[in-house]
From Swiss-Prot:
Component of the large ribosomal subunit (LSU). Mature yeast ribosomes consist of a small (40S) and a large (60S) subunit. The 40S small subunit contains 1 molecule of ribosomal RNA (18S rRNA) and 33 different proteins (encoded by 57 genes). The large 60S subunit contains 3 rRNA molecules (25S, 5.8S and 5S rRNA) and 46 different proteins (encoded by 81 genes). It comes from Saccharomyces cerevisiae (strain ATCC 204508 / S288c) (Baker's yeast). InterPro entries: KOW, Rib_uL2_dom2, Ribosomal_uL24_CS, Ribosomal_uL24_euk/arc, Ribosomal_uL24_KOW, Translation_prot_SH3-like_sf. This is Large ribosomal subunit protein uL24B. Keywords: Cytoplasm, Ribonucleoprotein, Ribosomal protein. Component of the ribosome, a large ribonucleoprotein complex responsible for the synthesis of proteins in the cell. The small ribosomal subunit (SSU) binds messenger RNAs (mRNAs) and translates the encoded message by selecting cognate aminoacyl-transfer RNA (tRNA) molecules. The large subunit (LSU) contains the ribosomal catalytic site termed the peptidyl transferase center (PTC), which catalyzes the formation of peptide bonds, thereby polymerizing the amino acids delivered by tRNAs into a polypeptide chain. Pfam families: KOW, Ribosomal_L26. Gene3D superfamilies: 2.30.30.30. GO terms for biological process: cytoplasmic translation; ribosomal large subunit biogenesis. It is found in: Cytoplasm. The keyword Cytoplasm applies.
Length: 127
């Protein structure tokens, strides 16, 4: 099948360069996670940029099935940390694990006026 738009490059090298050199404002959108089936039905949207205090479920990787609240979003590393998803160091200390938001599902949204405005702007519904 031919390319739909000639304005968009399908060159892998250019796509990777755009991803890894993206400014923080674009990384926010790149760090989006899908909503759970219940939230998707409730709000009428499929995914949202992840933020602190959202509750998530890990759906891929060795920590699959664990739940927790987002404690930090590290845009520079394309990573988020979930407060209950940690690993034990040899000395007994526990350290948070960096996860990519595409491997998470948002189970509870942290709603404030800006988040509500974003949902409405995306064409979603609020209760």
């Amino acid at each position: 099948m031919a390319k739909q738009s000639l304005d968009v490059s399908s060159d892998r090298r250019k796509a990777r360069k755009a991803y890894f050199t993206a400014p923080s404002s674009e990384r926010r959108v790149l760090l989006s996670a899908p909503l759970s089936k219940e939230l998707r039905a409730q709000y009428g949207i499929k995914a949202l940029p992840i933020r602190r205090d959202d509750e998530v479920l890990v759906v891929r990787g060795s920590k699959k099935g664990q739940e927790g609240k987002i404690s930090s979003v590290y845009r520079l590393k394309f990573a988020v940390q979930v407060d209950k998803v940690t690993k034990e160091k040899v000395n007994g200390a526990s350290v948070p694990i960096n996860l990519h938001p595409s491997k998470l599902v948002i189970t509870k949204l942290h709603l404030d006026k800006d988040r509500k405005a974003l949902i409405q702007r995306k064409g979603g519904k609020l209760e």
